[in-house]
């Protein structure tokens, strides 16, 4: 089973951050209701200081984890947060990311409160940092902060294909003898000591869907 749930709606936003904001019981009713993608500061068309959108701010999302999530892998993905992000679930730090131009994912399966409300808190630092691209040299565009791309949750089986990399290998200067190499990463978010056997069958097809090759399982 695999299902994707987009998490663009239902976020709370505050232009400041304090450590108590990560706590589940923190009252955010008076915060601004926002939808992703979102920028931490609305700016006029001209005549404004670039420091106006450089800040440490906070996003919070309340969500219910149903019983059917109990035996599944639950992964939350942010497509882009500018420029540093710290993520907390129910007051506990679960991950961080340092780049506004790359996506990142966090497995929250074992930290969820099943059958209850959960609170995801994101501390966003949009200030310039010379250690994070594109800062460190001259740039000719504005580097707005915030959760400025989409967010979503993927529901997967406890054991799932995490990544597949298919590439060819052709020896240089030799008679054409190409190899097709398939690298597959399998993850198990269930019991770590549980042994499982898998059979993976891969096929290659042309755009016309004509079958070309079935790769061996070894």
PLM region descriptions:
Residues 189-198:
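A short beta-turn/strand-edge loop motif at beta-sheet boundaries
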Residues 165-173:
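Short beta-strand segments of immunoglobulin-like
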Residues 210-217:
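Conserved small/polar residues in nucleotide/adenosyl-binding loops
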Residues 3-17, 39, 54-163, 189:
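Accessory beta-strand-rich segments of carbohydrate-active enzymes
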Residues 9, 87-89, 197-208:
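Extended low-complexity, serine/threonine- and proline-enriched intrinsically disordered segments
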Residues 46-50:
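Surface-exposed, low-complexity/disordered Ser/Thr/Gly/Pro/Asn-rich loops and linkers
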Residues 173-185:
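Contiguous beta-strand segments within globular domains
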Residues 12-36:
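Predominantly extracellular/luminal regions of secreted and cell-surface proteins
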């Amino acid at each position: 089973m695999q299902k994707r749930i987009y998490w663009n709606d239902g976020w709370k936003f505050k232009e400041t951050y304090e450590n108590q904001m990560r706590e589940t019981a923190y009252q955010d009713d008076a915060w601004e209701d926002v939808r992703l993608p979102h920028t931490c500061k609305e700016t006029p068309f001209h005549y404004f200081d670039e420091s106006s959108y450089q800040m440490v701010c906070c996003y919070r999302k309340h969500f219910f984890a149903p019983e059917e999530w109990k035996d599944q892998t639950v992964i939350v993905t942010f497509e882009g947060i500018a420029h540093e992000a710290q993520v907390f679930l129910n007051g506990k730090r679960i991950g961080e990311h340092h780049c506004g131009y790359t996506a990142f994912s966090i497995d929250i399966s074992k930290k969820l409160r099943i059958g209850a409300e959960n609170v995801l808190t994101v501390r966003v630092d949009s200030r310039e940092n010379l250690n994070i691209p594109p800062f460190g040299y001259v740039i000719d565009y504005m580097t707005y902060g915030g959760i400025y791309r989409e967010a979503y949750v993927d529901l997967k089986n406890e054991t799932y294909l995490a990544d597949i990399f298919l590439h060819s290998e052709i020896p240089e200067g030799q008679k054409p003898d190409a190899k097709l190499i398939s690298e597959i990463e399998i993850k198990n978010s269930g019991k770590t000591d549980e042994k499982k056997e898998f059979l993976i069958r891969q096929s290659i097809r042309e755009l016309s869907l004509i079958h070309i090759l079935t790769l061996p399982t070894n």
